[in-house]
Amino acid sequence: MKQYVVDAFTDKVFAGNPAAVCVMDKWLADRTMQNIAIENNLSETAFAVKEGSAYHLRWFTPGGEVELCGHATLATAYVITRFVEPELKTVAFDTLSGRLTVEKLDDLLKMDFPSFQLKAVPVTEQMIEALGVKPTSAKRTCTSAFLQAGKTAFYISN
């Protein structure tokens, strides 16, 4: 298995947002993918396996699997269209967040991205302890939480 480190959102080395990318013939055990992410110590390590005409894509942080990661999706599309299937103009990814597509436009990649509805969630003791104040409301998506305490708002990303 080859592993790439790609800096998303830039055309300069050591800039942008780095992600590790592993395009594989078959899945590794979840624990192995988690250990690779821990060893990489980047915000995300992406793992992709081609299944039919699309790639199944999963993202792991050093702390666990996440449901969505934009920069690692772009990084994976870059690796696929540059090294794995250079003739491909559109890459489809099946993910925990649904189908994502990335279109290759000359030297650029254009990605669709899902929008998420905010869901109200109960205020927990963990939230109060983390913020040092009791939020008056709490809402979340699959990737983020939004907490309000009076006129102050908090955004927390997974």
PLM features: what roles do these ranges have?
Residues M1-L68, L74-N158:
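Active-site proximal loop and beta-alpha junction motif in alpha/beta enzyme cores
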